[in-house]
Amino acid sequence: MAELQMLLEEEIPSGKRALIESYQNLTRVADYCENNYIQATDKRKALEETKAYTTQSLASVAYQINALANNVLQLLDIQASQLRRMESSINHISQTVDIHKEKVARREIGILTTNKNTSRTHKIIAPANMERPVRYIRKPIDYTVLDDVGHGVKHGNNQPARTGTLSRTNPPTQKPPSPPVSGRGTLGRNTPYKTLEPVKPPTVPNDYMTSPARLGSQHSPGRTASLNQRPRTHSGSSGGSGSRENSGSSSIGIPIAVPTPSPPTAGPAAPGAAPGSQYGTMTRQISRHNSTTSSTSSGGYRRTPSVTAQFSAQPHVNGGPLYSQNSISIAPPPPPMPQLTPQIPLTGFVARVQENIADSPTPPPPPPPDDIPMFDDSPPPPPPPPVDYEDEEAAVVQYSDPYADGDPAWAPKNYIEKVVAIYDYTKDKDDELSFKEGAIIYVIKKNDDGWFEGVCNRVTGLFPGNYVESIMHYTD
């Protein structure tokens, strides 16, 4: 406060007086310099003296103005601080008044209320009678409690080992996720999937059925041939569909002897064979001691040597006479299918054997009974008597590829492999393929997601890889 008073009473008024005096002195100095320049003989010296007076006068006036301005700014700062202190005091007083008003209001509100008596009790009340601890009694673990829970297959429903039924595995219940619709223009699978669509299981053709009634051993005239032992490895099915073998088969990796078949002779063919069939048949011959049991089926499944099923009794639907490797003529398309004839597709472990064997024609198998059920759920027939594997000769697997001698005109020039469809598939998207069982597809690209890109009947598209199986040709 004293500093403010000193500024207002002493320093600021003295600064004003100094400025007024400087103004008067500047007027006198100007008059002197003018007269001196006019009267002096040495004009140059007079000019230099005038410059010196001018510089000194301006410096003196500037100093006085600076001192007065600093005093005024200091005065303003002191007054601003005093205003802030006054504002703080006023705010404190207003808050005190508000607190007093709130206290008075609460007191007035409390007068209008009534007192309430509350009894305080403990939140947790201990029980009057303590519970006695239960004695631990060990109970044995029952491992069969969860046997009937879930969708598992019971152990009792498994088929006995080495049954004679020629069963067929179900189509895979899952396929690779369908490609997104955005990839319609291109056949690439590089674009990430957005939403996985539910998987539609493939449909099973109605013409598949087991033939329990045909399990009787059909004896045919014995065949003698020189056997070449060749180990055959099992080809697992693709797409998680499990093993292609029957669940009861126990000789998957047993080497079997492959006799060398002779080229077709001019003798009479079997009555059930279609002479112009384009597809081949798979013949399995099993020789035991002095009798030979032959079973003919139009499929590509690997069977154990103990299989004695006669599966194709009527005229061959999907096959015809066995063509040798030297046959070059292209056969006409296969005859129409009878509706009730059981059919096995050209799948499985497909082989083409180029060998020679002296073979005599076998009598045709008997016609099938009329009461064969479709997909019979009855228990399988009892297994045949055990076979001595040392005296048993292995089966011959022959398959005539319709495109073995040359690829068709619509086949691509460069492809990864040639596959055969083992299930029917109907396309879900526009860039996919639709094909029937037994169709030949040329794979031109394999994607990491399980989908293949291939050509079938002049149509290029995508298809799940677990619906096809590779065609492998064996040569000597």
Curated annotation (Swiss-Prot):
Q: List every position bearing Phosphotyrosine.
A: 53, 208, 423
Task: Tell me where in this chain the PTM N-acetylalanine is found.
Answer: 2
Q: Which residues form the SH3 domain?
A: 414-473
Location in or out of the cell: Cytoplasm; Nucleus; Cell projection, Lamellipodium; Cell projection, Filopodium
Q: Give this protein's Gene Ontology molecular function annotations.
A: protein tyrosine kinase activator activity; SH3 domain binding; signaling adaptor activity
Q: In this protein, which residues make up the domain named t-SNARE coiled-coil homology? A: 45-107
Q: Where is the composition biased (Polar residues)?
A: 156-170, 217-230
Q: Which PROSITE patterns match?
A: SH3, T_SNARE
The UniProt entry's GO CC annotations, sorted and at most eight, read: actin-based cell projection; cell leading edge; cytoskeleton; filopodium tip; glutamatergic synapse; growth cone; lamellipodium; neuron projection
InterPro entries, per this entry?
A: ABI (IPR028457), Abi1_SH3 (IPR035725), Abl-interactor_HHR_dom (IPR012849), SH3-like_dom_sf (IPR036028), SH3_domain (IPR001452), T_SNARE_dom (IPR000727)
Tissue specificity, in the record's words, reads:
Widely expressed in brain, high levels detected in cortex, hippocampus and cerebellum (at protein level).
In what ranges is there compositional bias, type Pro residues?
361-371, 378-387
Q: What about PTM? A: Phosphorylated on tyrosine residues after serum stimulation or induction by v-Abl. Seems to be phosphorylated at Tyr-53 by ABL1, required for nuclear but not for synaptic localization.
Q: How does it assemble?
A: Interacts with ABL1, ENAH, STX1A, SNAP25, VAMP2, EPS8, SOS1, SOS2, GRB2, SPTA1, NCKAP1/NAP1, the first SH3 domain of NCK1 and through its N-terminus with WASF1. Part of a complex consisting of ABI1, STX1A and SNAP25. Part of a complex consisting of ABI1, EPS8 and SOS1. Component of the WAVE2 complex composed of ABI1, CYFIP1/SRA1, NCKAP1/NAP1 (NCKAP1l/HEM1 in hematopoietic cells) and WASF2/WAVE2. Interacts (via SH3 domain) with SHANK2 and SHANK3, but not SHANK1; the interaction is direct. Interacts with the heterodimer MYC:MAX; the interaction may enhance MYC:MAX transcriptional activity.
Domain note for this entry? Answer: The t-SNARE coiled-coil homology domain is necessary and sufficient for interaction with STX1A.
**What family, per the record?**
Belongs to the ABI family.
This protein's name: Abl interactor 1
- Organism from which the protein derives: Rattus norvegicus (Rat)
